[in-house]
Amino acid sequence: MASGPHPTSTAAAAAAAAASASSAAPSAGGSSSGTTTTTTTTTGGILIGDRLYSEVSLTIDHSLIPEERLSPTPSMQDGLDLPSETDLRILGCELIQAAGILLRLPQVAMATGQVLFHRFFYSKSFVKHSFEIVAMACINLASKIEEAPRRIRDVINVFHHLRQLRGKRTPSPLILDQNYINTKNQVIKAERRVLKELGFCVHVKHPHKIIVMYLQVLECERNQTLVQTAWNYMNDSLRTNVFVRFQPETIACACIYLAARALQIPLPTRPHWFLLFGTTEEEIQEICIETLRLYTRKKPNYELLEKEVEKRKVALQEAKLKAKGLNLDGTPALSTLGGFSPASKPSSPREVKAEEKSPVSINVKTVKKEPEDRQQASKSPYNGVRKDSKRSRTSRSASRSRSRTRSRSRSHSPRRHYNNRRSRSGTYSSRSRSRSRSHSESPRRHHNHGSPHLKAKHTREDLKSSNRHGHKRKKSRSRSQSKTRDHSDVTKKHRHERGHHRDRRERSRSFERSHKGKHHGGSRSGHGRHRR
């Protein structure tokens, strides 16, 4: 629709615009938006801004679909073939006609509903929109346009009754449940959608009155059979798309032409009578062929059409999900990057070859072989460095266990202010126990290295050096390190070697008593420091 600024300043300006537009003649014709505008500019027009306007005329008599929108239609773009779409159009128009009769609507309202139905599905697809819901919306909207409104409840009840008759079931009233409420909301939304898609241009110019007027010009209005037959052809042509392709005057001439040929009533041919009404013979023949083709088609099968539409709908949904990278259930699909998708491989072997080994069994074997490799590495003569490191680790753990046993013996003693002899005897006993434990913790292969006298000497020196450090440091180191490393192993070994350790304990106690006098001063000084 073309429009321009409308002068509203003064009445004189409006009069000048009307005077300047007297030489302009509006053009008749249709456009895709349903409006026709004619604008003529003269030298005596009205200047508004930088433009000169003479007249703006708006007509909404009729709207036609342009040729480029007739094929392919939105339904054909969604995968629906042309015969199925034609059957759906015919079935929808038949539903509107039958519902209009049951609703006692005038024929003009039923014709308006069918034209709106055709217009809507030239902009939308049958796959995405239910034709039955759209048919309800179109007849409800047409009843309002033709000033014969009906309630939505009545429209839904009539379509429910027609559905039962089509399925050859016993008619039963519609239950007012949630399904009814959902259907009602769908009809209301579909009506709004029709208005939006048509740009609120829902005016339809019907050829009913034009047929009567043309027959009066031809002096055939008294022939009721001719009038009724032409009227019937016009109602049948509403199921085709001729009402969105041709002007109503051309359709009226084609209906009169068909009725006269069927009843063998002669009409003027020199010149042809339809030239008087501005119609060509090619257009009349095209409308007649399209209308007569309607009678050669089989009755559309509702169930097959529903299955076809549902099939196309599922295919469309699959294509959309595939474009988004999703499966049918909404879960994300596996990516084909890296060749991990089974679809990328032409064929996968069903049986695993004997030469190929499972990675799980290889991992298990490597785990089992690890301790054997460690034992072989410790026994080999080339790993002397590892043996020395192991010895140093065992000596460190022995010293830490000594400090731990000593701290435990002190913490467990109930009295700290005993005389020096009792404290010394307690420390010596704890030392002997720690020595025996440390010797039992060390591996058996290290027992032949050194005499017990040298080991006792080393342990006393380690004890003196450990006494010089802080008491808090001993506790933290002994608790954090000795517990985690070898406490579990020590408890297991003590359970199996109790008899052997008892003999060693007696030997260490006798050795202790013999050397008691030599180290009497050092131990006293150490205990004195701790008491301070």
Curated annotation (Swiss-Prot):
Pfam families in UniProt: Cyclin_C, Cyclin_N
Bias (Basic and acidic residues) ranges: 348-358, 367-376, 505-514
UniProt crosslink position (Glycyl lysine isopeptide (Lys-Gly) (interchain with G-Cter in SUMO2)): 345, 353, 368
Sequence positions bearing Phosphoserine: 341, 344, 358, 361, 380, 451
Phosphothreonine PTM positions: 331
Disulfide bonds: none
Region RS, residue ranges: 396-438
Claim: RNA-binding is one of the keywords in the record: no
One Gene Ontology biological process: regulation of centrosome cycle
Keywords carried by this UniProt record: Cyclin, Cytoplasm, Isopeptide bond, Nucleus, Phosphoprotein, Repeat, Transcription, Transcription regulation, Ubl conjugation
Family: Belongs to the cyclin family. Cyclin L subfamily.
Protein name per UniProt: Cyclin-L1
Native species: Mus musculus (Mouse)
